[in-house]
């Protein structure tokens, strides 16, 4: 598969909330880096991470408008688009909890799998909503 095909499949699995599909596309030493720089290492840790995130944001999706690939010794893709969803707590949608924001993602592809997935987005509005919104 080309790096574009791998990242396209990864985004498709994210939008389908297909945790098994996501983990099948990750290297065993996969690294996820969030917008605050927090690193989660390992496929199994990210299986738990995506499962938890999809329970908190059950309508999360990425709409990618552009992607670029550079192959300078390793295949790196940059994806640009919009992330959207709504915050749920205890399986209840929080009032006024829908959000949409620009997002960029850097992906490192190795052996037809995602070795690293780094998200660049301003998530402070979502974090603030989580701190202050009550059901």
Regions inferred by a protein language model and the residue ranges of each:
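Short helix-adjacent coil turns
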Residues: 17-21
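Short, solvent-exposed secondary-structure junction/capping segments
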Residues: 11-12, 24-40
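A beta-strand edge to alpha-helix "cap/lid" segment located at domain peripheries
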Residues: 2-6, 15-16, 33, 47, ...
């Amino acid at each position: 598969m080309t790096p574009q095909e791998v990242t396209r499949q990864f985004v498709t699995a994210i939008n389908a909330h297909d945790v098994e599909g996501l983990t099948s596309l990750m290297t065993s030493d996969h690294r996820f880096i969030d917008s605050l720089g927090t690193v989660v290492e390992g496929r199994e840790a990210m299986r738990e991470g995506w499962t938890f995130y999809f329970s908190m944001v059950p309508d999360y999706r990425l709409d990618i408008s552009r992607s670029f690939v550079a192959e300078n010794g390793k295949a790196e893709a940059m994806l640009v688009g919009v992330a959207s969803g709504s915050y749920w707590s205890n399986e209840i949608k929080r009032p006024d909890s829908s959000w949409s924001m620009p997002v960029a993602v850097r992906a490192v592809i190795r052996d037809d799998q995602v070795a690293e997935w780094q998200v660049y987005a301003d998530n402070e509005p979502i974090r603030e909503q989580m701190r202050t919104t009550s059901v």
